[in-house]
Amino acid sequence: MKYNNQIFLDEFKNKMLEINPQKVLFVCSKDYDRYGYRKALDEISIKSVSFTSFEPCPEVSSVENGIEAYKANECDFVVAVGGGSAIDTAKGIKFYSKLDFDILAVPTTAG
């Protein structure tokens, strides 16, 4: 089976255009640029910032730092790209911030 990343990125761009956020907080690993998500948002003129300061089995302090990044950068949407740690951190940011925003999770692992 061959995976076509461009097809997925096109679907991602279409979904983001539908959602139409002003600024996205990416919760992701430090090397997430290799997946092409930032470039995809740049192509459709949606601003984004990265939050990479979390560890496996995220601590509450990481979630608090994520909330700070979300607020300081005036984000209105979160995209979690990666495995369980990124997705769990994004869920923690939403839950503990008590702010009204949605999350889009993009798992990069399987199994």
Language model segments and positions:
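Glycine/threonine-rich beta-strand-loop-alpha-helix active-site module
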Residues: 60-111
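ATP/NTP phosphate-donor binding region
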Residues: 1-77
